[in-house]
Design a protein with these regions (language model features):
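Short cysteine clusters
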Residues: 106
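Short, flexible helix/strand-to-coil boundary loops that buttress conserved ligand/catalytic motifs
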Residues: 44, 117, 163
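C-terminal domain-closing interface element
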Residues: 158-166
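Conserved G/P- and acidic residue-centered "switch" motifs that form tight phosphate/ATP-binding loops
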Residues: 109
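Cysteine-based protein phosphatase catalytic domain of the PTP/DSP
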Residues: 5-6, 13-102, 123-154
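Short, small-residue alpha-helix embedded
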Residues: 113-124
Length: 166
């Protein structure tokens, strides 16, 4: 059975990889930790939010686990460099290989997050168009499912040009 996530989040691979909005509310962070998340991939620039890494670590310790945080800053509505996207995907895959469930987020969980999730799906065998369609299916039922993800034409073009070997 899939563990519950906050209303703005969704599973890409149940119990392994989830994505969504910034976990600003203490309740959302607690729900993510309760769902088993142990690695947070933060796509927001430092200073955009107050930060949650220490609270995530505290909640995880109380549950007998560890929560790690990695920041890969991408400006809002922006795109990463190809090398940065590789580093993000490598971080996700490294934590998954270590059996550490991962949560990927930006601010709203749409543009930057959708771009990363779709590129991760391409890395793992989906054609770019199929990855974008799968992303919409995965987001069905979230609080903002009607919103575009990725948000911009440039973000969608980035995914469409992404190849597994990138």
């Amino acid at each position: 059975m899939q563990r519950a996530l906050p209303a703005s989040a969704y599973w890409i691979e149940p119990q392994r990889l989830a994505a969504g909005a910034y976990p600003a509310a203490p309740f959302d962070l607690a729900v993510l930790i309760a769902a088993g998340i142990g690695g947070f991939v933060d796509l927001t620039p430092a200073g955009d939010h107050g930060g949650y890494a220490s609270e995530a670590a505290r909640l995880a310790r109380a549950a007998g686990r560890e929560a790690l945080h990695r920041r890969f800053p991408i400006r809002d509505f922006g795109l990463p460099e190809i090398a940065t996207m590789r580093a993000i995907l490598d971080a996700i895959d490294g934590w998954l290989a270590a059996r550490r469930p991962v949560y990927v987020h930006c601010h709203a969980g749409l543009g930057r997050t959708g771009t990363v999730v779709a590129c991760w799906l391409v890395r793992h065998g989906r054609a770019p168009a199929d990855a974008l369609a799968e992303l919409q299916r995965l987001r069905h039922g979230t609080r903002d499912a009607a919103a575009a993800s990725p948000e911009t034409d440039a973000q969608r073009a980035f995914v469409e040009s992404w190849r597994p070997g990138n």
